[in-house]
């Protein structure tokens, strides 16, 4: 990154501590001759995107939900993100609130590490036309409607027909996202440095298709049964779209979609241990 001149600051709406820290950060930037735009996380998407013209880095203060909702809007312009944790879990957000001054000093002096994370590009296809598309940082799910007992989804990988899977839904995830819904659905936990996508069926009626780890270059097409009752596409557990009969969802991976600043000593496996996703019992061998 060139000399930092323009920053974006977004704090979790309704969190007074995050709001106060956001204003402190804006003052810190002012003393460094860095201009900054400051918003709460409920800013309209169109207004947020208008503010990105000169943005070189985004500081997001909140939990994983705030991080996901704001970061999705930064993917297209490849704006790096630094997350400060004001949430309950904070799996995606590394920095503790008390450490923000040291982290910004490291950011300003180019001492943080910029990691490139895989994201998903998804599109809803209707009558051979893309009618909606976007990005996902964690995962996309084609799931059953509220009134449906089970959903039949036709699955194709690189135009090769895999078959029809009957389940509560089909979950496609990035490596970063496998630590969330994917492992809860008994899918694989994949290190984020692995160039791959995963496909997991949720509560499968007949366990005929195991969780799959697929090359990043894979194109996945999911087509719900035309008789399905309001099948639903969910993006990062935050955005939802009702699918009509004969709609298909196309999903691909993007190698360097999300740029995240981390500390030089960051360890993914250690992070998993801290969050309780990797544990062991001490005993004498």
From Swiss-Prot:
Cofactor section: a divalent metal cation
GO cellular component: cytoplasm
GO terms, biological process: NAD metabolic process; NADP biosynthetic process
Enzyme Commission code(s) on record: 2.7.1.23
Residues at the active site: 64 (proton acceptor)
Pfam families: NAD_kinase, NAD_kinase_C
UniProt keyword annotations, A-Z: ATP-binding, Cytoplasm, Kinase, NAD, NADP, Nucleotide-binding, Transferase
One Gene Ontology term of the molecular function aspect: ATP binding
Family matches, as InterPro entries: ATP-NAD_kinase_N (IPR017438), ATP-NAD_kinase_PpnK-typ_C (IPR017437), NAD/diacylglycerol_kinase_sf (IPR016064), NADK (IPR002504)
Coiled coil: none
Cell location: Cytoplasm
Domain of life (superkingdom): Bacteria
Protein's job: Involved in the regulation of the intracellular balance of NAD and NADP, and is a key enzyme in the biosynthesis of NADP. Catalyzes specifically the phosphorylation on 2'-hydroxyl of the adenosine moiety of NAD to yield NADP.
Family: Belongs to the NAD kinase family.
Name assigned to this protein: NAD kinase
Annotated organism of origin: Lawsonia intracellularis (strain PHE/MN1-00)
Native organism taxonomy: Bacteria, Pseudomonadati, Thermodesulfobacteriota, Desulfovibrionia, Desulfovibrionales
């Amino acid at each position: 990154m060139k000399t930092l001149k323009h920053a974006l600051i977004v704090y979790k709406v309704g969190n007074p501590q995050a709001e106060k820290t956001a204003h402190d950060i804006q003052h810190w930037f002012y003393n460094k001759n860095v201009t900054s735009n400051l918003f709460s996380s409920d800013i309209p998407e169109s207004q947020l995107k208008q503010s990105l013209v000169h943005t070189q880095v985004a500081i997001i203060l909140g939990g994983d939900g705030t991080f996901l909702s704001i970061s999705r809007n930064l993917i297209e312009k490849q704006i790096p993100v630094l997350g400060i944790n004001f949430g309950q879990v904070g799996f995606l957000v590394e920095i503790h609130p008390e450490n923000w001054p040291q982290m910004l000093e490291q950011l300003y002096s180019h001492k943080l590490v910029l990691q490139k994370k895989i994201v998903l590009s998804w599109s809803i296809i209707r009558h051979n036309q893309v009618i909606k598309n976007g990005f996902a940082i964690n995962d996309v799910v084609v799931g059953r409607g509220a009134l449906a007992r089970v959903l039949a989804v036709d699955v194709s990988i690189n135009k090769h027909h895999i078959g029809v899977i009957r389940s509560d839904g089909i979950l496609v995830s990035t490596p970063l996202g496998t630590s969330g819904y994917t492992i809860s659905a008994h899918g694989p936990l994949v290190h984020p440095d692995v160039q791959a996508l995963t496909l997991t069926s949720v509560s499968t009626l007949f366990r005929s298709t195991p969780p799959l780890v697929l090359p990043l270059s894979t194109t996945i097409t999911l087509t719900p049964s035309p008789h399905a009752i309001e099948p639903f596409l969910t993006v990062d557990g935050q955005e939802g779209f009702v699918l009509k009969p004969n709609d298909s969802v196309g999903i691909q991976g993007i190698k360097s979609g999300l740029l995240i600043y981390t500390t030089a000593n960051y360890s993914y496996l250690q992070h998993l241990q801290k969050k309780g996703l990797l544990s062991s019992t001490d005993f004498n061998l």
